[in-house]
Every structure is written in structure tokens, then in C-alpha cells.
Amino acid sequence: MDFPGLIKKIKEDLENRLVEKSKQPAFTDYWLINKTISLLKEYPSGFSYPILINEIELACSERNKLDNVFSSLEWLTKSDAVIYLEDQFHFHCYDYYYTPIPSLKLKDSEENTCEMILHSSFYLLFHEPFNILKGSTLRFSQSRIHQKWYLRKQIRFLPTTSFVPVLQYAASKSFVKSMVESTEHEFFQIRDITISKSDQGVKRITVELGRIISLDKKGAFLIDNNTNFIHFSGTYHDFPKLLDKQQYLLIPFWSTVWEGSTNWQDGMIGILVILSENDFEEKKCDSWQVGRLAAVNSNFLVLDNNGQRVKILYSNSQKHYFKDTYIGDLLCISPINHSSDNLSDYSCVSDTTTEILSNLENPLSSNFLRNDLCKFSNLFSGVSGHLKIQPLTLVITGFVANLTRQSDLNTSLVLPEVNPLTAKMEVIDCLRNSFWAALRPNCVSYFASMISGFKELFQKEMEFPIYLDLKSYKLGFHWCDIYVDSEHNCHIQKINSLPCE
């Protein structure tokens, strides 16, 4: 099954399951694609389709639960209600007061009210130009309820530093514009959120940020190619959970006080700005495309989608979306917008993301996703899928430095420098048919790790090409992800890390 077919099947099955359980399906294609890909990354050894659909259904239910339970106050008044520090709350701030203790007046979607004592780190939000609390949505966690709240007959949350005001872009354009134009404060796009652990087992969360340079004539964000990283640990480990990937974060006084900081510190404030699909004309579509990367130019790329050529336009500030891609990679690009002039043309938007599906382990180890080509004779121009191959000969042809070539579209193909070596390999399929295929540079590294003395070859002065006979290594059969381009050249994009049975 191909990836678009997989997404279509998941969507149909998930909608049917939710309807059977009297639940309203409430998810977008964009959410479904991202959740599916994150699961494929989480389980690289592979899993069955029933497990996949169950995981996605659970995630969908949890998503709805967060929207309903933690934005309601009713359940908190029950005697058996248990509140955990990691619980997140989303409430609307309708007012605040300064004395005797600076506090916020909050309400849920059913107009039930409560209060929250504001942590002193956020007193800046009472003053111009940051007095945006009234009318905003507040997200917070790591907060307890005042033990004697019942004396006031109103729930009262204690102060917390895991606290983020959330603004809707459409309702705060003038504020956003003034912040982007400011030389003291900085707006960032939240590109990614990753979790890692140190050698001592301490969890650290890293948020990848792209700086907003300016706004275009339509008010859309123009984003710098460079990336900033901020790490969260200790008392701030929960803060990134309050953020949304591909949305926008304002950090006051970044340019004058916090610039160069790599760790979130006491006194830092974040304000989240949410863009809806209708905020800009170019974001009215939520399209996505899957295909093999066939060509890259200075302002567009071309995908080969089962023989159909799809052009996707991007600006200079969006080049980083494709920085790790290589000709022949199977890409999933979303969301993108249809061109008004040509239905086969698309353009990137500010929250476009690119996933290299052919780099995932799962398509090579999960039967429900693998497109088994069975034998070499099934390979022809435009075909892509998976094939069992056994390596015979490895030929190192040179270094990937300023490597370009011409395609049938008469556009210059720029092959990004992913690895310094490029190579081709002679292989055989299960029927003992032999053929040659170009190797994606990361595949060269894979075989280099299996060949003794490989590094020593390049410590000597040797001329390319370098021929290595692999028969004596008895490498066995491996699943590979393979693609045949328009010039009938075979490209091996990914080799399974485990030999086939």
C-alpha cells in the first residue's frame, strides 16, 4: 500500500470507528498525516495496521478529551477530582485585578468562572504594549488549586511558570505587526519540538525556532532560513507542551536581554499566536502531495507522483523546508496551496513541512505499507517501491560537491551535500537478475560500516572510481527502497538495517 492510500484508508476507518462510538469525527488531513508519520518514526521496527489505527484512534480521543475536559471547570468541583501537575488547562481570561494579589479572572466554555494568582514573572503582561491578557486564551500546567478555595466558593489556581497567553492572529494583527517591526522583541515560528535525555537520564526538550523577518503585503510571515534552538529542563520541562508546532511564539526583549540564550530562564515570557486556515488567502487550501523528488530549482521543485509531474513553488525564506532532501527521495509535503493558474502547481505556505518517507524504517518492515515490486523486471520509468536485493559490487564514483546535472525538464538539479561520497552498486534480485543502481549518499555510509578497512581506503591517495567486491562479505538479501527516474536510472534510497529472512 502506498502512503496516500494508507492515509485514505486510515481516514475512512477512523471516521467509521468514531461514528460507531457516537463520537463526532474532528480531525484534519494535516493532523492525520503528521500523527501517522510520528508513529512511523516512533516504531521503526514496524507494526501491524490494527495497531496503527488503534494508536491513531487513541490519539484522536485524547485530543478531544483535552479540548473538552481540561477546558471545563465542572469536574474540578467534584470531591473525588484529582489534579496532577502535568494536567493542562485552557481557559478564557475576561478580566484581572492587581490588589491585594494580582490575579486573573477566568471562565470556561460554559461560562463557569475561576481565578488564578499570576506568577510575578508575568507582571509585564499588565503593562503596555503587552497588556494582552484580557480577551486571550490562557494555557497553563504545573498548577495546584488553593486548598481553601471553597471558602470563597470559587476555584483558585496557584501561580505557575508553565503559563502561555494565546492570541488569535486575526484579532491581534496590529499587536503582531508592532512586535515584528520592533527592534527589541522577536517573533519566531515553532518549527519542531524534540525530547532527549542526557547521560544522567535528565529529560531535556528542545524547541526549534525560525525568526520572523517581516510581514508581506498580505500580512503573511516571512521567515529567516537560520534556526534558533532553546532548551527546556528542570522546572520548565513542561512549558513546550503548551506550544503548537508550526505556530508562532513572541519572546519579549529577545534582542536586548535574551539574545543568544540557549536555555529558557527565569523571567522569560512567551506569547503564542495562532494562525487559522482562513487568516491569509493563500492558506484557504489544506492540500498535500506525495511523490519522488525529480528536480530542484532556485524557486521550485518537481515531484513525480506516479508519472504525473507536480511543481511546488517556494520562496528564499522557505528553502530550509527541503534542506535534507535528495533527488529520488519520496517526500510528503503539507500543507500546500493550489495555484490559481495551473491545478498541477502548488505553493508552500508559512507552516509547510516536509517529511522524507523513503528514509523511514517502517516502509521497509511493515507489510501493510511496503509496496513490494517482487522482481527487477517490474522496474520501469516512474516506478517506485521496495525490492529484495543482494549487493555484489560497490563502486565509489566521487564526492558530492557542487554536483549538478540536467534533467528532461531542462532545469538544473541541485543535489544537496548530504554525504561526501556518491556511489553506484551492482545488485541481484531474488530471481538472480543483476542490475546497477545509484546509491543515495546515506546508503554509502550504511555499507561502509559493514566493510572492514573501508576508512583506510580513503587515507591513501586513490583515484575514483574505486571498485569493491562485496561477494566475500556475504551480506545477504536486504529490503531496499528503489526508484526509477525518467531517464530509466535506478536509485536506491534506503536500505533496511536488518537483513531479510
UniProtKB/Swiss-Prot annotation:
Compartment list: Nucleus; Cytoplasm
A GO CC term assigned to this protein in UniProt: site of double-strand break
A Pfam match: CDC24_OB1
Record's keyword terms, sorted: Cell cycle, Cytoplasm, Nucleus
Superkingdom of the source species: Eukaryota
GO biological process, any: Okazaki fragment processing involved in mitotic DNA replication
Keyword Glycosyltransferase part of the UniProt annotation: no
The keyword Transmembrane is annotated on this UniProt entry: no
InterPro entries in UniProt: Cdc24_OB1, Cdc24_OB2, Cdc24_OB3
Function per UniProt: Has a role in the progression of DNA replication and in the maintenance of genomic integrity. Acts during S phase, after initiation, where it is essential for completion.
Subunit-structure text: Interacts with dna2, pcn1 and rfc1.
Name of the featured protein: Cell division control protein 24
Species this protein is from: Schizosaccharomyces pombe (strain 972 / ATCC 24843)
Gene it is expressed from: cdc24
